[in-house]
């Protein structure tokens, strides 16, 4: 027997804004949704609502990178038939495909665990703090001397494997892929761009697959109506479009230590709230 309650419109709007703001920042959108849900609404919206609302932020990626995506697709299609047309964009298309394979395999193997997964706040808080060390180390050792023409299939596979860490709430998809890119010598902006392109197939597949569960959660959580899911997706799109534009400009001039500090403050703060039993872990 599952304990399911309906989401309020206020909850939908707040969580959609949180989703849009945090999806592209290396701070974990799923972790923030779990934290905000528990602190403000005393209940987790659930992984399915997160996955569906992510469709809005991924549409934001499609809009922001629209010209790049069309150019890559065009180059990839031409390169399939004409060897002379195998440009850097052609190979980038293949690298996105290769980098998507790890999370597709893990998603299929662990689909039941992902669908029914509960997000304990102690896991979220611990991951926020622990993975901030990885991000800081990547920023410290990253040479940032490789350009897009120097990418290869091994790089794509490494970043793709790093993307699977995003299944752990509190890690962050962008945090894991940008860190992997920095370890490989890519500059911050290129690492972020490649990570965002890599996320498109996986997030769209996850979001579409999770739509039925968002209406009827299979574990304890909150259910949403079709209108609420639509509004949440639109809000996440608008806020996400602003966020991705801001982040890429920010990364040109600033390092990731700002986000490292933020993650530690939030993670430690949540652990303190759990220790004094101000909020429940689940």
UniProtKB/Swiss-Prot annotation:
Record's subcellular location: Cell membrane
Catalytic reaction list: di-trans,octa-cis-undecaprenyl diphosphate + H2O = di-trans,octa-cis-undecaprenyl phosphate + phosphate + H(+)
Highest taxon of the lineage: Bacteria
A GO molecular-function descriptor: undecaprenyl-diphosphatase activity
Residues annotated as transmembrane: 90-110, 121-141, 165-185, 194-214, 228-248, 256-276
First-tier enzyme category under EC: hydrolase
GO cellular component: plasma membrane
A single GO BP: cell wall organization
UniProt keyword list: Antibiotic resistance, Cell membrane, Cell shape, Cell wall biogenesis/degradation, Hydrolase, Membrane, Peptidoglycan synthesis, Transmembrane, Transmembrane helix
UniProt cross-references to Pfam families, sorted A to Z: BacA
E.C. code: 3.6.1.27
Topology within the bilayer: Multi-pass membrane protein
InterPro entries: UppP
Family membership: Belongs to the UppP family.
Primary role: Catalyzes the dephosphorylation of undecaprenyl diphosphate (UPP). Confers resistance to bacitracin.
Additional observations: Bacitracin is thought to be involved in the inhibition of peptidoglycan synthesis by sequestering undecaprenyl diphosphate, thereby reducing the pool of lipid carrier available.
Name of the protein this chain belongs to: Undecaprenyl-diphosphatase
